[in-house]
């Protein structure tokens, strides 16, 4: 039962957030919203531990369609970066500000880039494309994400500085157009570079938040060198081109949890695990790659 510690803790964290916001703001929506997301994410991790091949995709579809379709389109909440800046400038700790605080700013201290692999509605679509692994080394234009990040900030700042009316209506259309552009660019890059995750690597501005926080992640993928046969296959099949055999926090191209799932069916040995970063003990199950908390 110890291997189910991670989904249990994940659900507990989201339930704590759900109850706290419900009681603090007096709005039952927060209880239902974060409970649903927590259950969906925990379910995906649980199914993964049970060896279900499409486990991560279950969480992606449950959370991604809910946030894009229900919150974004039906409720007209801009859950993109522009929505975060808008509510932040408005002094309102609701909607996108809470979402970013939980999923992309403070949450990564616990689950790293789990957002990218389990909940992102952009990656949800891109992961259906045929190029699971990159055919070559990373390109040198990852700096584009910083331009996108800055453009998002300046766009919302201009709405306030220029006194533009109907900001929420503008942001709703920005949400629709922005997501359409993200999908178009993501699909184009996937086919152009033969890499489903090209958008994530070079364009997505969210990594500006995720990268520094996930560096200190409580749970992270580590290699048990006593099991590793140094075949190098994990590096070749990892969708985010991570040097999985390097347990250092400074290893190149630190990753999201989806890297584990991209490799799980392709390795000859059970040498890579997800565990608390404070320990390096190998914990092994029946899958080549699996998420299991340490005993210590």
Task: Locate the predicted segments by residue.
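Non-ligating segments of multi-cofactor redox enzymes
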Residues: 1-246, 255-258, 262-265, 270-295
């Amino acid at each position: 039962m110890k291997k189910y510690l991670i989904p249990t803790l994940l659900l507990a964290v989201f339930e704590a957030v759900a109850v706290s916001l419900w009681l603090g703001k007096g709005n039952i929506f927060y209880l239902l919203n974060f409970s649903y997301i927590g259950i969906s994410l925990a379910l995906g991790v649980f199914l993964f531990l049970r060896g279900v091949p499409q486990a991560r995709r279950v969480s992606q579809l449950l959370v991604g369609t809910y946030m894009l379709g229900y919150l974004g389109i039906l409720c007209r909440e801009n859950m993109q970066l522009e929505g975060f800046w808008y509510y932040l400038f408005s002094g309102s700790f609701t909607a996108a500000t809470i979402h970013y605080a939980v999923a992309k700013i403070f949450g990564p201290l616990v689950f790293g880039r789990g957002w990218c692999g389990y909940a992102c509605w952009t990656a949800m679509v891109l992961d259906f494309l045929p190029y699971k692994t990159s055919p070559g080394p990373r390109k040198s234009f990852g700096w584009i994400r910083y331009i996108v990040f800055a453009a998002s900030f300046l766009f919302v700042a201009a709405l306030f500085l220029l006194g533009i009316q109907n900001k929420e209506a503008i942001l709703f259309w920005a949400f629709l157009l922005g997501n359409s552009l993200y999908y178009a660019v993501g699909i184009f890059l996937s086919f152009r570079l033969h890499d489903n995750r090209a958008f994530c690597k070079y364009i997505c501005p969210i990594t500006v938040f995720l990268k520094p926080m996930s560096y200190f992640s409580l749970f992270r993928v580590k290699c048990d060198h006593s099991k590793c046969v140094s075949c190098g296959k994990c590096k070749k099949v990892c969708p985010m081109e991570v040097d999985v055999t390097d347990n250092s926090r400074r290893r190149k191209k630190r990753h999201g949890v989806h890297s584990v799932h991209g490799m799980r069916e392709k390795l000859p040995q059970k040498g890579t695990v997800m565990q608390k970063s404070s320990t390096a003990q190998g914990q092994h199950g029946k899958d080549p790659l699996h998420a299991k908390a340490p005993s210590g």
